[in-house]
Amino acid sequence: MKKALIIGGGGFIGSNITQFLLENRDYNVDVIDNFSRSASGKTPLLEKYRESDRLKIFNADLTKIENFDQLDRDYDYVFMLAAMVGVDKVNAVPHEVIRVNSMLLLNSLEWLRASSCGRVVFSSTSETYAGTIEAFGYDVPTNETVPLTVEDVSHPRFTYAITKMLGESGFINYARQGYFEAVVVRYHNVYGPNMGFRHVIPHLVERFQKNESPFLIYGHDQTRAFNYIDDAVLGTVLAVEKGTNQEIYHIGDSDEISIETLTCFVGKLLNYDGDYEYAPTFPGSVSRRCPDITKAKNDLVYSPSVKWQEGVTSTINWYLEYLKGAETSQESFYDQYGIKQ
């Protein structure tokens, strides 16, 4: 039986990958995370499988390299997903984003170099090339050969992207030395149930629940291609199983929509009948983002199947049910994600 390790398996994407492997692959799965995403220290998806003899869960701070010692050294597949992420984090504590993400990367690379693992997938982001689109007008949809650009190295917004650029280079160049095989996946606006609160779709739910009127649409003409979690998970697993060593793959969807279209769709689902008004978005937010996924389709046979309308509806329904349950539970929705009301 093959063995998989998910570094950062307590997060949104990591916990869904864990579920996929346990239900769709004959793998033993180890998960290691500091579980900081949840104030309770628990991840509902993982709790479902806690009694499985194919799953082991480790709670550890991997900025301390000695905490890798509790792991095996011979995994067939390693998913490196751990990172400090979020617009709130890069704006509030950019120095911590740099410190934590850099240490996670370097500790993981050094542990892998001393181990005998097979293939590694490193999770990157479309943020790595966001500056290129704005500064140089590269084509949208955008493929993997786009140069990576940081418009202002001093701006806190780019700290996350800079650490992901470091990770892409680090994993590819360690793989080039023969320590392991590595592929990189760049995620593009992954969303779905239980994604947390600091994302555009659950944030829209919260705002509509407050009956804001007029409802402000921030960056109404900006466009994104949203990638449902089930498709992102499958793309990631296919990348580590089938991807070419030292290659980068864009994992996303090619259906580009405007923020206005998304907002009005969510409003309709939530029976909003008030007015809308346009408002400026956050500084540094790119005007368009949509991946060219031709390479992933050809190499991985990756084909996202969940249309955005279907995925958004499923996500909204999940949040409505969760919020309804949180009203009577001791731990509120906000408490779970450590959010100050």
What name fits each language-model region?
Residues 7, 98-102, 160-161, 194, ...:
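Short, solvent-exposed loop/helix junctions and linker helices
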Residues 12, 85, 195, 257-258, ...:
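Short alpha-helical
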Residues 17, 209-341:
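C-terminal substrate-binding subdomain of Rossmann-fold SDR/epimerase-dehydratase oxidoreductases
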Residues 37, 63, 97, 192, ...:
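Glycine-/small-residue-rich active-site loops that bind phosphorylated ligands and cofactors
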Residues 40-43, 91, 197-198, 229-230, ...:
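Conserved strand-to-helix beginnings and helix N-cap segments that scaffold or border functional pockets
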Residues 133-144, 165, 169-240, 254-256, ...:
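NAD(P)-dependent short-chain dehydrogenase/reductase
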